[in-house]
Amino acid sequence: MVVTASPDTYLHVIDYGLKKVRLRFDRLLLQAFMAGVYIGMAGNACISLAGGFSTDPADPKAITAGVQKFIYASIFPVAFIAIIMTGAELFTGNTMTMLICWFERRITIWQLLQNWAGSFLGNWLGTMFSAYFLTYLCCPFDHDPYLSYLNYTAASKVSYGWGSCFLRGVGCNTWVCLAVWFVVACDDAAGKILALWFPIVAFVLSSYEHIIANLYTLQLCAMLGVDTSLADMIAFNLLPTLLGNLFGGCGLIGMVYFYNFYPVVGHGDDAAEGSICGSSEKEECPSLVGVPRGASVNSLAVSAIPSVFSAPRGQRESFAGESSTLVMGDIKRQRSMASTRKLGGGADKKDVQLTVRQFDETEMQSTMEDMFGLEDPRNAPKGNPGTNPPSKSPESSATGGTGAAASPTATS
């Protein structure tokens, strides 16, 4: 598992958000719908196992409430693993990524609100579908111990109070956005899964409130006819949880790390009118990150480092495998080059891209000789560094330069 540095991870979070902006609204809804389905399916698995145990002390087969909660918490991260690996859209994670992109002036406020609204609507429809078709119609949760477990769950969720539920939402989305940050920082699938599992388990064990998970659970409780009314679920749980999740993702994670890294790796005063990411999938979208993660040395033979403001989006890999091999010095040099150019808006502006050769020593020699017909200058004989090469005489110039003065290997 390779973990990138925090400034580099911050740049990948921006790229991650820009990819979400480029989604058509129908695709955004579909991917958000699937994220809601995954949340519901994981919730179904959690209820099937954790809800099947009794916590009554009089029952000899009973388990403690803490063990029951840990069983639930250990299964629930499967939903987030499915969301990350399939590229589905989860509202709670988007609160951090889209806010950072907006603060970086890479998207407009309309694009931010459109993404939030689309992802929340799709998540809600997905949880409703999962609660009705994948749980209510097929899974027998209408009897004990499952019905008692869901009845207790709904009653406890509306009994926290507005302030407590809001703060539980703040803590929950802080963990969720940290999980997204950890996933971006990791290089391989196994590392992403391992890094994702612990934050999700932590928020479930802490009894924090997640708006999308609560949408599935409380809709299922309403379908089963628990004692808690739907109005109380909305007023005393769903609404404060939604606001708390927004504050946790935007305030504790998005604003904090934007403030922490913006003077170092952000655009700052170099931002131009043309740096806003377009909403069309066919338009170019600026990328702050360079060489894709996970590619071998041979595949990066003639890779291009995108400039700060212009790089084709199609050249980048998927989020599951992207990263940057650039260090902070490379990023600063790119910003310095970009600031010396005369910047202007418009989609027809073309940027100069630098080719990077990442050959090892043997590949460099063979490639220069076979592909370009050139000799490796490192193998050429070197002259005395203390002497200057003789000047070229008119006779040697006229005869084609056969003397030592015309030798291309002479060095000063």
Swiss-Prot record:
Inhibited by methyl methanethiosulfonate (MMTS). Partially inhibited by the Malaria Box compound MMV007839. Partially inhibited by BH-296, BH-317, BH-326 and BH-388 compounds. The chain crosses the membrane at residues 33-53, 70-90, 117-137, 165-185, 193-213, 238-258. It comes from the Eukaryota. GO terms for cellular component: plasma membrane. InterPro entries: Aquaporin-like (IPR023271), For/NO2_transpt (IPR000292), For/NO2_transpt_CS (IPR024002). GO terms for molecular function: high-affinity secondary active nitrite transmembrane transporter activity. Residues 330-349, 367-412 are annotated as: Disordered. It is found in: Cell membrane. Residues 1-32, 91-116, 186-192, 259-412 are cytoplasmic. It is a multi-pass membrane protein. Keywords: Cell membrane, Glycoprotein, Membrane, Transmembrane, Transmembrane helix. Glycans are attached at N151. It catalyses: (S)-lactate(in) + H(+)(in) = (S)-lactate(out) + H(+)(out); formate(in) + H(+)(in) = formate(out) + H(+)(out); pyruvate(out) + H(+)(out) = pyruvate(in) + H(+)(in); acetate(out) + H(+)(out) = acetate(in) + H(+)(in). Residues 396-412 have a biased composition (Low complexity). One of its GO terms (biological process) is nitrite transport. Residues 54-69, 138-164, 214-237 are extracellular. Belongs to the FNT transporter (TC 1.A.16) family. Homopentamer. Monocarboxylate-proton symporter; active in acidic-to-neutral pH range. Transports L-lactate and formate. Probably acts as a primary L-lactate transporter in extracellular tachyzoites. Not sensitive to p-chloromercuribenzene sulfonate (pCMBS). Inhibitors modestly slow the asexual reproduction of parasites. Frameshift mutations that are likely to render the resulting proteins non-functional, have no significant effects on tachyzoite proliferation in vitro. This is Formate-nitrite transporter 1. It comes from Toxoplasma gondii (strain ATCC 50611 / Me49). The lineage of its organism: Eukaryota, Sar, Alveolata, Apicomplexa, Conoidasida.
